[in-house]
C-alpha cells in the first residue's frame, strides 16, 4: 500500500487557564445573533413538508372533532381506520384549496393570501355560490 503525503500542521500554543478567560471589560459586550433573511425559513419549511408524507393535522384534536360530530347524530359510529381516512381526505382537500388560493394570490400580484383569495378559489371550484 502506498504512503500518503502528510502536510505540516500549524503549531498550537499552549495557554494557561487564566489567559483563556475573557478580560473583565469585554464580558459585557454581547455578540449579535445571526438572523435568516426573510422568506428563507418559510421556503425551508415548505420543502420539508412537501418531502414528508406524514399527516399535518394532529390526530387527537381531529379525532375529538369527529367524535363531537358523531355525538350529534344518533346511531353514527366510526372505526379508527375510518377516522384516519377522513383525516387523509381532509388534508388532501385543504392542501389543494390552499394551492388554488395561492394561485389566486399570485394572480393578484401579492404574496400574502387573504380571505378573498380563498373565496375566489371556492367560487371557481363551484363549492360556494
UniProtKB/Swiss-Prot annotation:
GO MF annotation, one: protein heterodimerization activity
A Gene Ontology term for the protein's cellular component: nucleus
PROSITE patterns found in the cross-reference section: HISTONE_H3_2
Subcellular localization(s) per the UniProt record: Nucleus; Chromosome
Principal localisation: nucleus
Keyword Cell membrane: no
Basic residues bias spans: 10-21
UniProt xrefs under Gene3D superfamilies: Histone, subunit A (1.10.20.10)
InterPro entries on file: Histone-fold, Histone_H2A/H2B/H3, Histone_H3/CENP-A
Record keywords, A-Z: Chromosome, DNA-binding, Nucleosome core, Nucleus
Start and end residues of each stretch annotated as Disordered: 1-36
Keyword DNA repair appears in the UniProt entry: no
Subunit structure: The nucleosome is a histone octamer containing two molecules each of H2A, H2B, H3 and H4 assembled in one H3-H4 heterotetramer and two H2A-H2B heterodimers. The octamer wraps approximately 147 bp of DNA.
Biological role: Core component of nucleosome. Nucleosomes wrap and compact DNA into chromatin, limiting DNA accessibility to the cellular machineries which require DNA as a template. Histones thereby play a central role in transcription regulation, DNA repair, DNA replication and chromosomal stability. DNA accessibility is regulated via a complex set of post-translational modifications of histones, also called histone code, and nucleosome remodeling.
Family as reported in the entry's similarity comment: Belongs to the histone H3 family.
PANTHER family: HISTONE H3
Name of this chain's protein: Histone H3
Amino acid at each position: 500500500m502506498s504512503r500518503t503525503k502528510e502536510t505540516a500542521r500549524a503549531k498550537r500554543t499552549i495557554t494557561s487557564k487564566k489567559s483563556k478567560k475573557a478580560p473583565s471589560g469585554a464580558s459585557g459586550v454581547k455578540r449579535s445573533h445571526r438572523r435568516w433573511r426573510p422568506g428563507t425559513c418559510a421556503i425551508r419549511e415548505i420543502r420539508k413538508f412537501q418531502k414528508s408524507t406524514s399527516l399535518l393535522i394532529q390526530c387527537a384534536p381531529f379525532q375529538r372533532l369527529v367524535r363531537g360530530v358523531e355525538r350529534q347524530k344518533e346511531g353514527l359510529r366510526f372505526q379508527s381506520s375510518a377516522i384516519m381516512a377522513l383525516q387523509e381526505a381532509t388534508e388532501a382537500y385543504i392542501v389543494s384549496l390552499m394551492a388554488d388560493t395561492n394561485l389566486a394570490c399570485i394572480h393578484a400580484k401579492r404574496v400574502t393570501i387573504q380571505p378573498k383569495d380563498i373565496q375566489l378559489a371556492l367560487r371557481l371550484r363551484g363549492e360556494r355560490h
